[in-house]
A protein has these predicted regions:
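Hydrophobic core of transmembrane alpha-helices in multi-pass small-molecule transporters
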Residues: 10, 75-79, 90-114, 118, ...
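Multi-pass alpha-helical transporter architecture, strongest
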Residues: 53, 81-87, 190-202, 394, ...
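C-terminal ends and interior cores of transmembrane alpha-helices
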Residues: 73-91, 311-325
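A membrane-interface helix-boundary motif in multi-pass transporters
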Residues: 155-189, 388-426
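Juxtamembrane intracellular "pre-TM" segments in multi-pass secondary transporters
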Residues: 201-237, 263
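C-terminal transmembrane helical hairpin of 12-TM major facilitator-type secondary transporters
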Residues: 303-350
Length: 445
């Protein structure tokens, strides 16, 4: 069963890895560069409602793996529609494309919590401890994300020809999936495979008949009872503040690295032309660091695990602001490597923490509530503000890149200032969390 759950996470995150980091570049090329923040904020917008809602259904009405499969199948259909639209419209209409993407997210984002709920249930049904087994399974999600990133970074399709390249001097390099709507098609295909696969997983227990649900049940409002626990309340408030950091680099790091292609001193840099590949170092770091979460929670406690995560976010933004593909390449690499600590020490530790804090009838609610606070409220508000900050320093323009190649639409301007602003923000939140969080002694298992 460990192998089957590992495959689930591999596919689950490969769907996301196909487009998440390079989606901003696609939007910019399609004339929606000034609206990047709204597309990444949409991740948070749907997380305000759908994870807790589907978590409620998983707790009360249907097996979580059934909902997981159904959501993936619905999401893949909508993503296919987004690919069809983007392929036939070189200049994207904001309303049409945003609604398609919002529809995809409405079905895909609940699968994050549903996959965790399904996995935790299967582990417990076999006498296992989620604290010990979950990180070893979740690491395959990171591997799937990396594999998808590498594929879209190097694969191209042009004039009936399919192949792979990393060289900007290759005439087909500008048709790589990281620059084109093909990233959406690959995501859709993987979503179809994930949905079908999820439906083959075992059902831990059949759904029980429940009394008619109240409005608070339907919208997951009872999950907010967890706010009565002081330590959980503090964590969830800071989950909102930490959620601000989650989507910033996803939305802007690849366009930022790509912009160096238009600067003469970096135009021949392999890193500048392979931003998605460079960005994948973040996920490689995540894969190596994920197994540290359980050890860290036992040895230094939840409070310091989250504090370290926030300090890592600050270091990531700082290194992005000071780095470049030339003599500052080491700083870009460091910014990618610290992501493993920044993401895992918040995300994985947070999900384990909420699993412990929720009672047996509300495990799905607990997972959904964390998604709502971090990926929902935090990521939505944070990304909108971050987009305004970046747009005040940078703008999209058609610029020449490598000699003989067609001009590209790139995000040009003063990138150092916004990255330093984000670094200062994360540092401030880290200090506040260390000062404010106090927990009742808890054994994590």
């Amino acid at each position: 069963m460990k192998t089957r759950l590992s495959i689930l996470y591999f596919l689950q995150f490969a769907v996301w890895g196909c487009y998440l980091s390079c989606f901003g570049q696609l939007l910019g090329a399609g004339g929606l560069g000034a609206s990047i923040q709204w597309f990444y904020a949409a991740v948070g917008l749907v997380s305000l409602f759908t994870p807790a809602l589907f978590g409620h259904f998983a707790d009360r009405f249907a097996p979580s793996r059934t909902l997981l499969g159904a959501c993936h199948l619905a999401a893949c259909v909508v993503m296919f529609g987004a690919w069809t639209y983007a392929s036939s419209h070189p200049q994207l209409d904001f309303t049409a494309f945003f609604l398609l993407y919002l529809g995809f997210l409405a079905f895909y984002m609940p699968t994050m919590a549903l996959s965790n709920t399904t996995t935790f249930a299967i582990i417990r049904s076999r006498g296992g401890l989620p604290m010990e087994q979950f990180p070893k399974l979740r690491i395959w999600g990171t591997i799937g994300f990396i594999a998808a990133m590498w594929f879209v970074n190097s694969a191209y399709y042009h004039d009936g020809s399919f192949g792979f390249t990393l060289s900007d001097s290759d005439p087909a390099s500008h048709f790589r999936f990281q620059y084109t709507p093909m990233q959406l098609l690959v995501s859709s295909i993987l979503g179809l495979l994930t949905g079908l696969y999820a439906l083959t997983l075992p059902v831990v227990k059949a759904p029980e008949k429940k009394p008619a649900a109240s409005l608070s049940d339907i919208f997951g409002l009872k999950a907010f009872r967890l706010f009565k626990i002081p330590s959980v309340r503090t964590f969830l408030i800071f989950a909102v503040l930490t959620g601000v950091c989650l989507q910033i680099s996803n939305g802007f790091a690849v366009p930022y690295i790509n912009h160096f292609m238009a600067r003469a001193e970096y135009s021949s840099s392999l890193a500048a032309g392979n931003a998605t590949l460079l960005f994948s170092l973040s996920q490689i770091s995540e894969a190596f660091c994920i197994l540290l979460v359980g050890v860290a929670m036992k040895r230094i406690g939840f409070r310091w695990v989250i504090t370290i995560a926030l300090l890592a976010w600050s270091a990531r933004f700082l290194c992005l602001g000071l780095g470049n593909p030339g003599d500052g390449l080491i700083l870009l690499i460091i910014s990618m490597l610290v992501y493993g600590i920044a993401f895992n020490f918040f995300n994985i530790a947070g999900h384990i923490y909420m699993e412990q804090a929720s009672d047996t009838s509300n495990k799905g609610f607990g997972q959904g509530l964390l998604m709502l606070m971090s990926n929902g409220i935090g990521a939505t508000g944070g990304m909108i503000i971050a987009g305004s900050v970046v747009n005040s320093f940078c703008h999209w323009e058609m610029v020449p890149t490598t000699p003989g190649a067609a001009p590209m639409r790139l995000f040009m301007g003063d990138w150092t200032s916004p990255w330093l602003i984000f670094a200062a923000y994360a540092l401030t939140v880290a200090i506040l969390f260390a000062l404010c969080y106090r927990a009742t002694t808890r054994k994590y298992n």
